[in-house]
Amino acid sequence: MINVFIPHRWNNDDYSTISSLLDRTKFKVRDYSVPASSPFDSIDRRYNVDPQIQKQIRYASVVVCSNRPANNNGMSIDEIKFALSIGKPVVAVQVTFSSSTMIAGLGVETIPCRKDSLENWIHRNV
């Protein structure tokens, strides 16, 4: 069982792209991301990452984000930074031709949006 957290925004389809890619891997996946169907009632803005989301990230074995430049700021990058700070393995799946400079600057590996690439990365990092 691989526990996964996917930092995302709901204004693009990165979450569904990454979720579908995970579903095609040979791993049984438990998704700890925040689904659109049951978002948290409120986000505590006193924190860079809301404690409810921190808890979800702590449950995850890995964090899988997109390479989208929109991840350069906002909650997604804060979630990625938090995951790295607590030692979670983080990978960016290449869903666009352009990549986030922030994600690259954090040393997050970017892999092709392919099942075998994600499986190999998980094997190396879990």
Predicted regions and their residues:
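Glycine-rich, charge-decorated loop segments at or immediately adjacent to ligand/cofactor-binding or catalytic sites
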Residues: 97-111
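Conserved N-terminal substructure of TIR/SEFIR domains
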Residues: 1-59, 126
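Structural motif
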Residues: 61-64
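A short helix->loop->beta-strand "cap" motif at the edges of active sites that frequently abuts
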Residues: 85-95
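Structural motif corresponding to alpha-helix initiation and N-cap regions
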Residues: 46-50, 77, 115
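Short, polar loop motifs at secondary-structure junctions
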Residues: 33-35, 94-100
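C-terminal helix of von Willebrand factor
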Residues: 111-126
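Conserved TIR/SEFIR loop-to-helix hotspot centered on a Trp-containing motif
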Residues: 69-86
